[in-house]
Design a protein with these regions (language model features):
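C-terminal helical subdomain
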Residues: 360, 368, 372-413
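Conserved glycine-rich cofactor-binding loop
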Residues: 188-189
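Catalytic loop of short-chain dehydrogenase/reductase
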Residues: 307-339, 344-345, 349-352
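Rossmann-fold cofactor-recognition segment
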Residues: 225-241
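Conserved mid-core segment of classical short-chain dehydrogenase/reductases
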Residues: 245, 263-280, 303-309, 329
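Conserved glycine-rich Rossmann-like NAD(P)H-binding loop of the short-chain dehydrogenase/reductase
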Residues: 204-221
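A short, exposed helix-loop element centered on a Lys and neighboring polar residues
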Residues: 294-295, 345
Length: 427
């Protein structure tokens, strides 16, 4: 059984901070489809459209009928553990620093046999006395992103076990906020306050909550979350580089997860309002504010990516499903989020070398004041915050919470041009 994670002793400031060595990242183009699915929290394998055989490892032609018509499809993950072994030596620096490492061979119910990483509880069950009576333990295989941002396969126990998320190997594949220190950039909004509550429920050790306009605290709900023992209020104005730099100098070396939820949202297109003041305000926070924050806190996260059990691990961007295709009634807001999405892809590429996960969140309309005139369904702040915490635990890179976001994503994947035409027509 996995032992619960405990708060480690305070770090000796004189000791050298280890540098991150990421696992091997080389993958072929076909195999990257496995990573693309894992980034969204799905376990997919290739399936032949002619003979229905499920394939692994990824390939160009079916191993049974040689057909090239292979489609990536989500799999249940159920299977049987056939064999296990323990890796005690590796020339790869990532694994060398984390030995011993459990590996296994799993026969999937859908067909292929997979070499997988073993969750500690599976390995213990396979090595224990009960293994003689049940040598082929039932397992649940899932895809996770490793510290290099590439998909790996992990065999989990068929049924949930106590403290399952605290497994040493699994924590290398996730960004669980439990016992970690988190910065939430805007605590004045319902989403920011919901994030704080969700993080506390998930076991976060300390949460810094940013506020740009302290004179607006009354009636904003900020006093309620400030009263929580895990919360520390900090001044943070993303439109002011001096404010961002000062906060990074004060807490940058302690933050494990940054959640950038600060945004300006106005409901204008191009012709609805003369001038550029509203669009500038949106870009100033949604894009340039994000850029200032990334420049100030990014190097600190990278420097602590291998700093013990509770190392720096993740950056979360609250974007919008409007970043994929412009929603004309909120046209300038959509444009600012599209710019932020592009910047987030650059940030992900830069932080990947240090093993820092960048989670981009693309919610549909949030149930707040600026979406008042949009009809349901709209996602609540609490539902959005819960989805973000779950995505951190699962180690995902892309999250589309809410019914509208899921629908738009499917339409965008099917045909981006058709979605553009539908949105222009108000559909």
């Amino acid at each position: 059984m996995t032992m619960p994670l405990l708060q480690p002793p305070r770090k000796n400031p004189v000791k050298r901070t280890p540098q991150m060595n990421v696992p091997p990242a080389a993958r072929g183009r076909v195999a990257l489809n496995l990573t693309a699915a894992a980034a969204a929290g799905r376990f997919e394998l290739q399936q032949c459209l002619d003979c229905s055989a499920v394939q692994y490892p990824p390939r160009e032609a079916c191993v049974h009928c040689l057909s090239s018509r292979l489609k990536w499809r989500e799999q249940s993950g159920a299977g049987q553990l056939l064999a296990r072994t323990t890796l005690h030596h590796s020339n790869d620096l990532f694994f060398r620093e984390r030995l011993p490492w459990q590996l296994g061979l799993v026969q999937m119910d859908c067909g292929p046999a997979l070499v997988v990483h073993l969750h500690g509880d599976v390995a213990a069950q396979a090595a224990g006395p009960q293994a003689r009576q049940a040598p082929q333990a039932r397992v649940q295989v899932g895809a996770r992103l490793d510290r290099a941002g590439r998909a790996v396969l992990i065999a989990f126990p068929a049924e949930e076990t106590p403290h399952m998320a605290d497994d040493t190997m699994l924590r290398e594949m996730s960004c669980d906020p439990r016992l970690r220190k988190v910065l939430v950039t805007d605590g004045m909004t319902p989403v920011g306050q919901a994030l704080v509550r969700a993080l506390i429920q998930a076991g976060a050790d300390l949460i810094w909550v940013g506020h740009a306009e302290p004179w607006k605290r009354h009636g904003s709900g900020l006093d309620d979350i400030t009263a929580l023992p895990q919360v520390s209020l900090v001044p943070l104005d993303l439109s002011n580089e001096r404010s961002v730099t000062a906060l990074a100098g004060a807490i940058g070396g302690k933050v494990d997860i940054v959640i950038n939820n600060a945004e300006v949202h106005r409901t204008f297109g191009i012709q609805a309002r003369r001038g550029t003041d509203a669009a500038k305000a949106e870009m100033e926070i949604n894009y340039f504010g994000y850029l200032r924050l990334a420049q100030a806190f990014g190097p600190a996260l990278m420097g602590r990516a291998a700093d013990g059990t509770l190392h720096a691990c993740a950056w979360v961007n609250l974007l919008s499903i409007y970043a994929l295709a412009n929603f004309p009634p909120h046209g300038t807001f959509s444009a600012s989020k599209a710019a932020a999405h592009s910047l987030a892809q650059c940030q992900r590429a830069e932080l990947r070398g240090a093993g820092i996960r960048v989670l981009n969140v693309f919610p549909g309309p949030i149930d707040d004041d600026w979406n008042q005139n949009l009809p349901p369904p709209k996602i609540s702040a609490d539902a959005l915050a819960g989805a973000v915490v779950k995505a951190l635990r699962d180690g995902a890179e892309d999250l589309y919470p809410g019914e509208v976001a899921q629908e738009w994503l499917e339409r965008w994947r099917d045909n981006p041009k058709v979605l553009e035409l539908e949105l222009a027509a108000g559909a």
